[in-house]
A protein has these predicted regions:
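NAD(P)-dependent dehydrogenase/reductase Rossmann-like domain
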Residues: 273-391
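An N-terminal-biased, well-structured beta-alpha scaffold segment characteristic
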Residues: 1-80, 212-214, 218, 235, ...
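N-terminal Rossmann-fold NAD(P) dinucleotide-binding loop
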Residues: 148-149
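Oxidoreductase and adenylate-handling cofactor-binding alpha/beta cores
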Residues: 89-108, 155-160, 286-299, 334-338, ...
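Phosphate-binding beta-alpha-beta segment of Rossmann-like dinucleotide-binding domains, i.e.
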Residues: 73, 81-138, 302
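Rossmann-like adenosine-cofactor binding region
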Residues: 44-46, 168-259, 275
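Glycine-rich Rossmann-fold phosphate-binding loop(s) that bind the pyrophosphate
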Residues: 144-145
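Hydrophobic Val/Ile/Leu positions in short beta-strands of Rossmann-like dinucleotide-binding domains
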Residues: 5-7, 141, 321
Length: 391
């Protein structure tokens, strides 16, 4: 079987080679592919084709994908966590250093000089750009995942005192965070004690406008705020008030909107955080591997809307089911198999929210019986999508 993949944006070709020979890359021409691979393409407001089974975002965020719509249609949405983490980490650390010494403004000033006495002008004017060192300053990191954890560790190595806040940090991630990073239980402590604050959390209804009037009201004067996560995490109206009051000395963001441009205390980058050759390659490779594993085996890794499910395929056939998370669904699946006198080699059912995912491995060589079972599932209530995979 050959799977069709539609790509959006410029996906690294080395990453696409991870798909292997069983995949046909149709660029953006296919009208009804099995999978999408994309970066920043906005899919909101679009209808998904009937064959579409998977969407892989070559990046960490999925705000450009209507995840709820995909879930309801039985489409698994993947991301590539950690693939661009080092790139974003370096961008944030560079931003801290740039803001501490005001290098960008200093460069603009120096480029405006002219004449034979430029060296003299430099010596006379450089005092206005005298900054501070970051050693012994306090950095507050909100979100200690793949990116935030790296920033916290390296900021400590640069001599900073580091506070970290993340009530949802995984055990695996926690093991990789330096013991010198002080974990705080209340985000207010980050606001109150930090000279620099950087945020690395997804945009949800709970995190939207994390930096609002109340948050800025807790901060000490002269705080630098760095946002390489999502623009909407900051209430811009409250930000302007904080800038005017001197609470925020500088705001550095990777998400430009017109109202933030040309402000002397705001530095806007054109979404460069994860845009390095290495990061784009890593994201493409991870996206390619993820799509290949899912399409060929049904296994799910790094999905945002379905649980991770991994199980080696040893039986002749595997049926994957995306179903609504309702009582007795596993019993109904088992009964349907039993009614056709088919032996179950292995079954895994895991849920996430209102939906669940089932891997059903069948020790049966009669393909007609397997097809009868597939037809039965496709006509069953609360089962959204059925796939048949042959070993």
């Amino acid at each position: 079987m050959v799977f069709s993949v539609k790509t959006f944006n410029n996906i690294n070709q080395i990453g696409l080679k991870e798909l292997g020979n069983a995949f046909q890359i149709d660029g953006d021409k296919s009208d009804n592919p099995d999978a999408y691979i994309l970066r920043s393409q906005n899919l909101h407001g679009q209808e998904f084709p009937s064959k579409l089974k998977a969407i892989a975002r070559a990046g960490a965020g999925t705000n450009n994908i209507p995840v709820d719509q995909a879930t309801a249609q039985g489409i698994v949405v993947f991301k590539t966590p950690g693939a661009n983490a080092n790139a974003v980490k370096e961008a944030v650390l560079a931003s801290i250093l740039l803001s501490a010494r005001d290098y960008i403004a200093a460069n603009s000033w120096a480029n405006g000089l002219s004449g034979d006495d430029v060296p003299k002008q430099v010596e006379a004017g450089k005092k206005q750009f005298a900054g501070t060192e970051i050693a012994e300053k306090t950095l507050g990191v909100i979100g200690l995942g793949a990116i935030g954890g790296r920033i916290a560790n390296d900021a400590y190595r640069l001599g900073m005192n580091v506070l970290g806040y993340d009530p949802y940090v995984s055990i695996e991630t926690a093991w990789n965070i330096s013991s010198h990073v002080k974990r705080v239980a209340d985000i207010k402590e980050i606001f109150e004690k930090s000279d620099y604050i950087t945020i690395h959390v997804p945009l949800t209804e709970d995190t939207r406008a994390t930096f609002d009037q109340e948050a800025f009201g807790l901060m000490q004067k002269g705080t630098t705020l760095i946002n390489f996560a999502r623009g909407e995490l900051v209430d811009n109206a409250a930000l302007f008030e904080a800038l005017e009051a001197g609470v925020i000395k500088r705001y550095i963001t990777d998400f430009g909107v017109d109202e933030l441009l040309r402000h002397p205390q705001i530095t806007v980058f054109p979404h460069l955080g994860g845009s390095t050759e290495e990061a784009e390659l890593n994201c493409a490779i991870m996206a390619g591997k993820t799509i290949r594993r899912f399409m060929e085996t049904g296994e799910i890794i790094n999905s945002v809307n379905f649980p991770n499910v991994r199980q080696a395929l040893s039986a002749p056939y595997r049926i994957t089911l995306i179903n609504k998370n309702v009582p007795n669904i596993v019993a109904r699946i088992s009964t349907a198999v039993s009614d056709l006198n088919i032996n179950i080699d292995n079954i895994i059912n895991r849920s996430k929210g209102d939906y669940a995912y089932t891997l059903l491995d069948l020790d049966e060589s009669d393909q007609s019986k397997i097809q009868d079972l597939v037809d039965k599932f496709e006509n069953s209530d609360n089962i959204v999508r059925v796939r048949l995979i042959k070993k």
